[in-house]
Every structure is written in C-alpha cells, then in structure tokens.
C-alpha cells in the first residue's frame, strides 16, 4: 500500500490548480516527500510528464536511476503504474518512483548477472594498507572463483605510473579489463561500456583498496546506476582501520551488501549439485585468513 499523499485541498490555495499556470490540466506531481502542483496540456502523454517531473525536480533526480510513473487511482485508493498510452484528460495526481531500491535489495547473486571489480591492488600500497597481504590472498581466491564460474573481472590501477602495477600475486589470467585511472571511483567510461556489453548485469562484487575512498566511491556510483553492490569485507582495507570501519558502516546503511569471500562463491553456485560446486568447495576448503580485519578499529 502506498503511503498517503497530501490531499488536494491541503495544497496552497485549496486546489491542485492553485499556483499552476492556467490553460492546461492541473496535475499534482509528487516525488519523494515533495508534492508540487503544475499544469500540462490536455492529452499530455508519458514523455511530456517526464519532462515536467524533471523541470520540477531536476536537481534531485539522479538520471542514472530507473523510474516508473504512477497514477493515483481513486477506485483503489492507491497509486498504480501509469497505464500504457495514458494521456492527461482531467486533474490527477502522479508520482515518480525510483526502481532500483525496490528491485535490488534481495542480495541474490547469479553468475550470468554478476561482475567482479578488483580495485587498485597495487605494489606501492603494500606497506601502507592494513593487512594488505591478507586481502591479496583473499582477492586472489575470489578471482579464482570468478574464473571457475566464468564471471567477468574488471581491474583498475590508480595512477600506475606513480603507484605501480597490480601486485604479482594477483593472477590476471582471463581478466576482461585492466584499466589505469586517476579518478577514485572505478566507474570510468570504459567500465560503463564494458558493463553495457554484458547482457543482464545486475550485481557487482567489489573488493580492493582503499575502503573509505575508491571502494566507497565506486559502490555509491554503481548503486546510483541501479546496480546492486556486494563488498567483500575480508578483501578490502584502508591505511586506517577507523576509516575502514566507518566506510563499511555507512555503505551498509545505504543498502550496499557487506559480505565475505566464502559467502560469495557459495551464493553463486547455490546448490551442491551445481556442476562447479566441487571446484568451489576445494577453493574455500582452507578458511580465509583470520586477520585483524575482524577488529572494529
């Protein structure tokens, strides 16, 4: 059941047309907690309504997200998806609803809809990042799992001219892309193009460094594009454990899934009868390092 929207009479001037330009059909445009009256030409369809939403709320609408327009149906007492071919003929209430929060919170992982992102596991970070050796070990195990299951892998290197290449322990065999970057987020134009080439991508499994910088900014940018993000807690770290802790807490509050290197491959196979289960079982037979990453600070 949709949350109650402000009544027409409660709006300024006592009507949805109040404050709306004359000569059109009055419509109440609702988005998030806001409701603004405006008017549109008689017969206005979906494209016109979207443009009106953008003119009213453009500074608040993330254009990378997917939305649905809904119409308040008096018959049902709640909002329903805008009927196909809808055209405005009388005053009505519409709302713009972002889809990805509702559609991507279950946390299911399947090989055809998943991509692995390995972020900036470079040699120059070795002395500075807490438990770097442990996250290299766990990251390498994740990449082995990706190869077993045929999952695409994208790797970035932050300013490799100054910070060096990906550490030698990370096996790049079969990796889809290895890209240099200066931007903190991994969401580069080349990465977006690569994702567009993979049909049905819904989830990204993300790991690397630093948790509170490149990992955090990558995760938030991906979520803004409607992609579900799983951050592997035992494969990400920072120079400061406090930075790492608060970044993971913040990301979890935004709906990003914080998981582990054992949970990910088991979720991907999902069944002991999966043809690759034995290989995954052998991969995770030895537990991940019990490092200080378990500490909060």
UniProtKB/Swiss-Prot annotation:
Specifically expressed in spleen and kidney. One of its GO terms (cellular component) is cytoplasm. Induction: Down-regulated after nephrectomy. Pfam families: Isochorismatase. CDD domains: YcaC_related. InterPro entries: Isochorismatase-like_dom, Isochorismatase-like_sf, Isochorismatase_domain. The modification N6-succinyllysine is found at residue 278. It comes from the Eukaryota. The modification Phosphotyrosine is found at residue 159. SUPFAM superfamilies: Isochorismatase-like hydrolases. Gene3D superfamilies: Isochorismatase-like (3.40.50.850). Keywords: Phosphoprotein. Belongs to the isochorismatase family. This is Isochorismatase domain-containing protein 1. The gene is Isoc1.
